[in-house]
Amino acid sequence: MKKIFNIFVVSFTLVFSSSLFANKIGVIYDSGGKFDKSFNELAYNTAERVKNELGWDLIEFEAANNTQIEQGMRKVADRGATLVVAMGFAQADAVAAIAPQYPNINFVAVDVCWVDDPAGNIYQAC
């Protein structure tokens, strides 16, 4: 759990340093939902801290199955997220497909380190 927390700290530091004017965080939860007592719940708690301590808006998406991830990621981006956090390696393909379509949005792909990044807007935390 400590390793996952460290990944978040590093990821958010990288993103904050290049997106000083960002004000909406979007979180796409992996299977298990945001209260899974593990990976997703850490993402939820971190996003809540960003919301409460930095004043950012929070946009969330919980897919019922993996086929909804890309659609949900697009919805979060279309709702104005300036930072999208994709939780888990199952979301790698969706990040790779969606991020180039939104070059002004930063994406953090947690537990992913093999995605091509032609737009330069994917931070891979693995």
Where do the language-model regions lie?
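Bacterial N-terminal signal peptides that target proteins for export
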Residues: 1-9
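Periplasmic-binding protein-like
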Residues: 81-89, 106-110
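Sec/Tat signal peptide C-region and signal peptidase I cleavage site
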Residues: 16-22
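Short beta-strand elements at the ligand-binding edges of bilobed clamshell
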Residues: 116-126
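Extracytoplasmic "Venus flytrap"
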Residues: 25-50, 59-66, 89-91
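Hydrophobic alpha-helical
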Residues: 87-101
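Short, well-structured alpha-helical segments in soluble
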Residues: 67-80
